[in-house]
Amino acid sequence: MNVELFKKFSEKVEEIIEAGRILHSRGWVPATSGNISAKVSEEYIAITASGKHKGKLTPEDILLIDYEGRPVGGGKPSAETLLHTTVYKLFPEVNAVVHTHSPNATVISIVEKKDFVELEDYELLKAFPDIHTHEVKIKIPIFPNEQNIPLLAKEVENYFKTSEDKYGFLIRGHGLYTWGRSMEEALIHTEALEFIFECELKLLSFHS
């Protein structure tokens, strides 16, 4: 690893560690669930290693991988690494991807029987950079909880290649994926969707 790459990787490691603490403090990555990544260059990505507690990450828990998910210098990356690399390939402007296992995202992915959650008329949708009014309707797709990650990654790729809604996705009974042009933006998008999912679940309870 050359000096410039090492410096950039080290910066992303610190971003991921801080993001892990934030996500854990909100209860969105219990136990060793979830994963976090950040783009280092057009060739490499920094990502959490498999089975690490996101609230207690150390620099040794963050791996450098290529865009095919292969680690550079050893270590076992997250089992869902290909979902991260798929997002980076789909959206070149993305510089961070966050995957959470929160109660709200998990529950809404189960109770919603369609293959998407439709969100509209929420002021907080303006947390996304291309949305400037609450008078909008977006879809967050729900994919089956497929253990064959290459197959799931292909399903995600096929969906977003033709969809105008590019804000995140759910895996049924599993959790949420969001992303952003920076780690800060990815965390903002996560928080916005978490709030809206909580509102949706409360509305469902009122209507039941």
Curated annotation (Swiss-Prot):
One of its GO terms (cellular component) is cytoplasm. This is Methylthioribulose-1-phosphate dehydratase. GO terms for molecular function: methylthioribulose 1-phosphate dehydratase activity; zinc ion binding. One of its GO terms (biological process) is L-methionine salvage from methylthioadenosine. It catalyses: 5-(methylsulfanyl)-D-ribulose 1-phosphate = 5-methylsulfanyl-2,3-dioxopentyl phosphate + H2O. Pathway: Amino-acid biosynthesis; L-methionine biosynthesis via salvage pathway; L-methionine from S-methyl-5-thio-alpha-D-ribose 1-phosphate: step 2/6. Its EC number is 4.2.1.109. It comes from the Bacteria. Catalyzes the dehydration of methylthioribulose-1-phosphate (MTRu-1-P) into 2,3-diketo-5-methylthiopentyl-1-phosphate (DK-MTP-1-P). The gene is mtnB. Belongs to the aldolase class II family. MtnB subfamily. Pfam families: Aldolase_II. Keywords: Amino-acid biosynthesis, Lyase, Metal-binding, Methionine biosynthesis, Zinc. InterPro entries: Aldolase_class_II_sugar_metab, Aldolase_II/adducin_N, Aldolase_II/adducin_N_sf, MethylthioRu-1-P_deHdtase_MtnB. Its cofactor is Zn(2+). Zn(2+) binds at residues 99, 101. Binds 1 zinc ion per subunit. Transmembrane segments: none annotated.
